[in-house]
């Protein structure tokens, strides 16, 4: 089998040296992706296309599908490469290939020709088209908007019968641009923004800020692995997980409620910039869209950018949510995003939309920056190829209960402000307060002879924290959902 790879048009308008470099990189990317399907596969580059030849017919569909997901490819032609003697021979081969496909259809013939021949491309179109029209009674020629377009390519003494055309994702080959670090949360925005930078030729590494709980990290790892495996598997990338729970705890205790969102984002940018500098990455990528939430106003984004010299790319800055969700659906991350928990432990009740720099800096003076340095130093760096094996390990499920027994105690893990606004009172059972950001250090001090029923407003935080505690060896935890 043979495939002809057509280049993304922006590649073809580059200077000769740049075009050759892009084609060379794309050829290497194709080899890296397809070698898993057929080790005997051959990839040959030309000035205006790339040929892929493989022997294992059983892998035809898999190879074709993989090619449509490699950045830099405009479209793929699946062809049958045969010799020919003259124009009538071209017609006979086209008739044998397309007879069944043209029954009862309108059609036209389009020919591309390279090399020296006694005929022109238009002459071949007329001869083959007329012959097909005569020999297939139910077929009819229609030059504009036909049901079927018969594509033929003539190159020297070879005829390429095009059996199918399949659209690629376009863009530039990965590796033609410099590396970036995507701040991935597993939601709609960060997945789409990561894809857009891969499509533009960047090798995308991933940085995840874990706000508490293994289940959330496993979910985000699966999203990152899916994006890499589907669109970027030609290159090795990193997945860096930073335990941001201590930072969140410090913010909740030391920072004014209205400034929390902006301060948290500034801390994330500081941490990600340190990671980027460590690995020689040139830019950060976020899924922020203008005005989508309170921290994404121009004033707040400017304040967030000011904490680092690292370039921050926001490919979705002018996109609305509906457009982003449609893109997530197209690339296959929608289902991941819909089931990803909305982790909102640091959402202010009255967040500022126009933060003042002096006020933000004054709030940050209360913050212990050694905590930030420590979590970055202890960040977990994983080769993304190892994630598939790690995520196959079962996550311990935690029992969810709606009632309680004589030995049960409800543990309210909401932030202090939330508890003050809406105190939890349940008849017939004790209620103890311990904010989620203190669980990792304070839960062990509680009476371990009791069964602790973790509770929060939405049930997401309580489940994540219960999973975390189970991983730490505490079996006496459940989730309370009345």
Swiss-Prot record:
Active site per the UniProt annotation: 456 (cysteine persulfide intermediate)
Binding of ATP, residues: 183-184, 265, 287, 296
GO MF annotation: an example: tRNA binding
Top class in the EC scheme: transferase
GO biological process terms on file: thiamine biosynthetic process; thiamine diphosphate biosynthetic process; thiazole biosynthetic process; tRNA 4-thiouridine biosynthesis
Superkingdom assignment: Bacteria
Name the UniProt record assigns to this protein: tRNA sulfurtransferase
GO cellular component term, pick one: cytosol
Limits of the Rhodanese domain: 404-482
Recorded catalytic activity of this chain's protein: [ThiI sulfur-carrier protein]-S-sulfanyl-L-cysteine + a uridine in tRNA + 2 reduced [2Fe-2S]-[ferredoxin] + ATP + H(+) = [ThiI sulfur-carrier protein]-L-cysteine + a 4-thiouridine in tRNA + 2 oxidized [2Fe-2S]-[ferredoxin] + AMP + diphosphate; [ThiS sulfur-carrier protein]-C-terminal Gly-Gly-AMP + S-sulfanyl-L-cysteinyl-[cysteine desulfurase] + AH2 = [ThiS sulfur-carrier protein]-C-terminal-Gly-aminoethanethioate + L-cysteinyl-[cysteine desulfurase] + A + AMP + 2 H(+)
Disulfide bond residue pairs: 344-456
Record's subcellular location: Cytoplasm
Entry annotated with the keyword Ribonucleoprotein: no
InterPro entries, per database record: Rhodanese-like_dom (IPR001763), Rhodanese-like_dom_sf (IPR036873), Rossmann-like_a/b/a_fold (IPR014729), ThiI_AANH (IPR020536), ThiI_fer (IPR054173), ThiI_N (IPR049961), THII_Thiazole_biosynth_dom (IPR026340), THUMP_dom (IPR004114)
Gene3D superfamilies on file: 3.30.2130.30, HUPs, Rhodanese-like domain
Pathway assignment: Cofactor biosynthesis; thiamine diphosphate biosynthesis
Membership in a protein family: Belongs to the ThiI family.
Native source organism of the sequence: Salmonella newport (strain SL254)
CDD domains, per database record: PPase_ThiI, RHOD, THUMP_ThiI
Chief place of localization: cytoplasm
Lineage: Bacteria, Pseudomonadati, Pseudomonadota, Gammaproteobacteria, Enterobacterales
Domain (THUMP): residue spans on this chain: 61-165
Job description of the protein: Catalyzes the ATP-dependent transfer of a sulfur to tRNA to produce 4-thiouridine in position 8 of tRNAs, which functions as a near-UV photosensor. Also catalyzes the transfer of sulfur to the sulfur carrier protein ThiS, forming ThiS-thiocarboxylate. This is a step in the synthesis of thiazole, in the thiamine biosynthesis pathway. The sulfur is donated as persulfide by IscS.
């Amino acid at each position: 089998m043979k495939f002809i790879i057509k280049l993304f048009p922006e590649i073809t308008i580059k200077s000769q040296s740049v075009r050759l470099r892009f084609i060379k990189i794309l050829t290497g990317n194709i080899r890296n992706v397809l070698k898993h399907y057929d080790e005997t596969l051959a990839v040959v580059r030309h000035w205006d296309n790339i040929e892929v030849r493989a022997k294992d017919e059983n892998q035809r569909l898999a190879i074709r599908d993989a090619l449509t997901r490699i950045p830099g490819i405009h479209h793929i032609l699946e062809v049958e490469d045969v010799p020919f003697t003259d124009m009538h021979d071209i017609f006979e081969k086209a008739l044998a290939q397309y007879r069944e496909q043209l029954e009862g259809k309108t059609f036209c013939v389009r020919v591309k020709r390279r090399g020296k021949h006694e005929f022109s491309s238009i002459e071949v179109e007329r001869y083959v088209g007329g012959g097909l029209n005569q020999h297939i009674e139910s077929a009819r020629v229609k030059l504009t908007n036909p049901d079927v377009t018969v594509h033929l390519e003539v190159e020297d003494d070879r005829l390429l019968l095009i059996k199918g055309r399949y659209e690629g994702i376009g863009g530039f080959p990965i590796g033609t641009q410099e590396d970036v670090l995507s701040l991935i949360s597993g939601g709609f925005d960060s997945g789409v923004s990561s894809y857009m930078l891969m499509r533009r030729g960047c090798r995308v590494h991933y940085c995840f800020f874990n706000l508490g709980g293994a289940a959330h990290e496993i979910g985000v790892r699966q999203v990152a692995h899916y994006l890499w495996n589907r669109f970027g598997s030609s290159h090795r990338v990193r997945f860096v997980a930073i335990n941001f729970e201590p930072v969140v705890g410090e913010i909740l205790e030391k920072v004014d409620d209205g400034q929390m969102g902006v301060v948290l984002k500034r801390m994330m940018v500081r941490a990600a910039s340190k990671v980027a500098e460590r690995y020689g990455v040139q830019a950060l990528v976020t899924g922020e869209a203008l005005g989508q939430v309170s921290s994404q106003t121009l004033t707040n984004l400017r304040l967030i950018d000011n904490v680092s010299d690292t370039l921050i790319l926001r490919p979705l800055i002018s996109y609305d949510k509906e457009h982003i969700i449609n893109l997530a659906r197209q690339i296959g991350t929608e289902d991941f995003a819909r089931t990803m928990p909305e982790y909102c432990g640091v959402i202010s009740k009255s967040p500022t939309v126009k933060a003042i720099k002096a006020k933000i800096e004054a709030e940050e003076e209360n913050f212990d920056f050694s905590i930030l340095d420590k979590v970055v130093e202890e960040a977990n760096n994983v080769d993304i190829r190892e994630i598939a094996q790690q995520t196959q390990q079962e996550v311990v499920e935690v029992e969810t209960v709606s009632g309680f027994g004589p030995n049960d105690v409800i543990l309210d893990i909401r932030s202090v402000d939330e508890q003050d606004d809406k105190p939890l009172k349940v008849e017939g059972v004790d209620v103890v307060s311990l904010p989620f950001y203190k669980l990792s250090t304070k839960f062990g001090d509680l009476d371990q002879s009791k069964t602790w029923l973790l509770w929060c407003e939405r049930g997401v935080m309580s489940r994540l924290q219960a999973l975390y505690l189970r991983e730490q060896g505490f079996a006496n935890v459940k989730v309370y959902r009345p």
